[in-house]
Amino acid sequence: MPEVIAPPLIPVGKIKSFGAFGPKYEVGRALRQLEDGDWLVEVKMVETGETAEYRMTHLFDDPEAR
């Protein structure tokens, strides 16, 4: 039987930016765990509505948007 892994706590709904001056994005749900233990999280670009997958470790390094 496959092991069930609970996704980490993700700040869903928070608005963050890619680095200090990058575009803003809204944090979505955890999608899947990667082989290195990191997680992919769905993010939605505030300006365009486009969605993308983003590593959780990068998400926690990004500042909250101003």
Task: Indicate where each model-derived feature is located.
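Short beta-strand-centered aromatic/proline hotspots
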Residues: 23-32
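Mixed-charge, Lys/Arg-rich low-complexity intrinsically disordered regions
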Residues: 1-14
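Short aromatic-glycine-enriched beta-strand elements
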Residues: 37-42
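Short acidic/polar mixed-charge low-complexity motifs
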Residues: 21-24, 48-50
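A short beta-strand micro-motif
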Residues: 11-19, 43
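Intrinsically disordered, low-complexity, charged/polar segments
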Residues: 45-66
